[in-house]
Amino acid sequence: MNKSVAPLLLAASILYGGAAAQQTVWGQCGGIGWSGPTNCAPGSACSTLNPYYAQCIPGATTITTSTRPPSGPTTTTRATSTSSSTPPTSSGVRFAGVNIAGFDFGCTTDGTCVTSKVYPPLKNFTGSNNYPDGIGQMQHFVNDDGMTIFRLPVGWQYLVNNNLGGNLDSTSISKYDQLVQGCLSLGAYCIVDIHNYARWNGGIIGQGGPTNAQFTSLWSQLASKYASQSRVWFGIMNEPHDVNINTWAATVQEVVTAIRNAGATSQFISLPGNDWQSAGAFISDGSAAALSQVTNPDGSTTNLIFDVHKYLDSDNSGTHAECTTNNIDGAFSPLATWLRQNNRQAILTETGGGNVQSCIQDMCQQIQYLNQNSDVYLGYVGWGAGSFDSTYVLTETPTGSGNSWTDTSLVSSCLARK
């Protein structure tokens, strides 16, 4: 999860025209308990995302209503509209899903991954059927929530049994592959995510720590294993931080080349930037400029997708239950402009909040914006389900009972697509 501590607070100004107040584009214009302006600025209309939150959507012409309060476990009808300032995107983002965590447990932000702390989301991991049922969760998310993608975090050390630069460990990769195959069997896209923060046991890859050759060896083996699987998505690294971005981009280039040369010639590859992959810092910290130079061996950038994260709490750390921002003005709007100008796309592979009203409000608004700008945003992946239990502050793990599952309020209100 994102550990950046650069808060981005939503600017919520109110414009006054004559005697009647008008709300700005993307501002709140209604909902239970709302006492502010209900008239929207010219060119936008008030659309209801849930009973507690309505928003001024550019280009919208109708007001829609939710079928239920957002705290319930059933499905919400959410508004979609097309912005007059961007290409038509009424169908929304292509990919929506959740992180299925567990193989990454034990990994810390210095790239140390204690393999004994791995808690795989595989129900029958030890033959006793008492582990979290990550495959069952994914089946529910696909069948009941219309999800199409899952990110499967795993520690580098786990995959090679702590042998830096070594071969994939046959036992470890067979266990992890059970989760990948379970994902693929559902028709979903499956992101193989190395959850090491651009490090191995404190050393930065290609910057005094592991060599680029040691890192590309890992990815060459993974790409070779999944070369025939068109729906396996290669997530190069989770949340690089405090790296030299130009040197890191050179490392990323070597990985992309290695993946393509291993036979995975057309699958999606995620390109992660500095500063914990912050969507708000992606342009300003030089990640956008540096990673724009990364290409496929043929010189194209086909299916090379920028990989960003963004949480909604006060310090963007993803550690608080309450949310304070929808990230539109501070992150996703300026990034959308840059992506359009440069003919590129991004995917949000971590985002989350508590199962409380402030997060339902802000997350639904954030997701709505991504759907409105699906020409540049391919999708979103919430954090997190899998081996997280109900006590985790950002849990998105559904509760299973027999053959049925009940979603958390944030998932049912905002992340689900049905």
From Swiss-Prot:
The annotated region (Linker) lies at 58-91
Q: What is this enzyme's EC?
A: 3.2.1.4
Show the Pfam families listed in the entry. Answer: CBM_1 (PF00734), Cellulase (PF00150)
Query: Which InterPro entries does the entry link to?
Result: CBD_sf (IPR035971), Cellulose-bd_dom_fun (IPR000254), Glyco_hydro_5 (IPR001547), Glyco_hydro_5_CS (IPR018087), Glycoside_hydrolase_SF (IPR017853)
SMART domains attached to this UniProt entry: fCBD (SM00236)
Q: Which PROSITE patterns match?
A: CBM1_1 (PS00562), CBM1_2 (PS51164), GLYCOSYL_HYDROL_F5 (PS00659)
Q: What class of enzyme is it?
A: hydrolase
Query: Where are the annotated segments for Catalytic?
Result: 92-418
Its predominant location is secreted
**What sequence ranges are listed for the domain CBM1?**
22-57
Instruction: Report which reactions are catalysed by this protein.
Output: Endohydrolysis of (1->4)-beta-D-glucosidic linkages in cellulose, lichenin and cereal beta-D-glucans
Residue numbers carrying Pyrrolidone carboxylic acid: 22
Print the keywords alphabetically. Answer: Carbohydrate metabolism, Cellulose degradation, Disulfide bond, Glycoprotein, Glycosidase, Hydrolase, Polysaccharide degradation, Pyrrolidone carboxylic acid, Secreted, Signal
Tell me a GO cellular component.
extracellular region
**Which pairs are disulfide-linked?**
107-113, 183-190, 323-359, 364-414
Point out the glycosylated residues in this chain. 124
Molecular function, one GO term: cellulose binding
Annotated spans, Disordered: 63-91
Q: Which family does it belong to?
A: Belongs to the glycosyl hydrolase 5 (cellulase A) family.
Q: What does this protein do?
A: Endoglucanase (EG) that cleaves the internal beta-1,4-glucosidic bonds in cellulose. The degradation of cellulose involves an interplay between different cellulolytic enzymes. Hydrolysis starts with EGs, which cut internal glycosidic linkages to reduce the polymerization degree of the substrate and creates new chain ends for exocellobiohydrolases (CBHs). The CBH release the disaccharide cellobiose from the non-reducing end of the cellulose polymer chain. Finally, beta-1,4-glucosidases hydrolyze the cellobiose and other short cello-oligosaccharides into glucose units.
Q: What is this protein called?
A: Endoglucanase EG-II
Q: Which organism is it from?
A: Hypocrea jecorina (strain ATCC 56765 / BCRC 32924 / NRRL 11460 / Rut C-30)
Q: Which gene encodes it?
A: egl2
